[in-house]
A protein has these predicted regions:
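Rossmann-fold NAD(P) dinucleotide-binding segment
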Residues: 71-89
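Aromatic pocket-lining residues of Rossmann-like dinucleotide-binding sites
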Residues: 18-19, 79
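Active-site-lining helix/loop region of Rossmann-like oxidoreductase modules
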Residues: 5, 133-175
């Protein structure tokens, strides 16, 4: 069983992707019950594995995808302490830092914690890493994305543009 916390544009895309490839039950929780109900009823007609859940119902999942706006660290800690693996799509620098600090907790509980599983960080880093193998050396990588996930993603993008960025350079994080 997989839980998805957040039924906005990003959470919807996560659920739509999961129902195509998996036949496991998917529990959808969103603080806005109307949003969760809309997603479950739209996908539930074709894929009977999608249902609306209370937050506490997600405790029955083996993995929870945190697809709502940040912060995710507190919610992730709750699930990890219940031996539930977590995938976070947060791209907020302080939230990602707090999530990464949960690594030893996740290991101690025998679960997986995936941080930054969105476009950037996430896919952009995986693509850069994969493509860098084709070159002798890579000095810089610039990523351009088209579109946005939704209103919460747009707000986070604007906050990110007005602040400091974090980069990985020669084996260490720099600001």
């Amino acid at each position: 069983m997989i839980g998805v916390f957040g039924a906005g544009i990003v959470g919807t895309k996560v659920v739509e992707t999961l129902v195509v490839d998996l036949q496991t039950e998917i529990l959808v929780h969103d603080p806005n019950k109307t949003t969760a109900n809309r997603l479950a009823s739209r996908l539930g007609e074709k894929h009977r594995v999608v249902s609306v859940a209370r937050k506490s119902d997600l405790n029955a999942a083996s993995i929870v995808v945190l697809a709502g706006p940040p912060p995710h660290a507190t919610i992730a800690r709750e699930f990890i302490e219940k031996n539930i693996s977590v995938v976070s799509v947060s791209d907020d620098v302080s939230d990602c830092t707090n999530l990464l600090a949960l690594d030893s907790l996740a290991k101690n509980h025998g679960v997986t914690l995936v941080v930054g599983a969105a476009s950037s960080p996430g896919m952009s880093g995986l693509l850069a890493r994969s493509m860098s193998k084709s070159f002798d050396a890579v000095d810089e990588v610039h990523i351009a994305l088209h579109g946005t996930g939704g209103p919460a993603c747009a707000r986070q993008h604007h906050r990110a543009l007005s602040g400091q960025s974090v980069g990985w350079h020669e084996g260490e994080w720099i600001r």
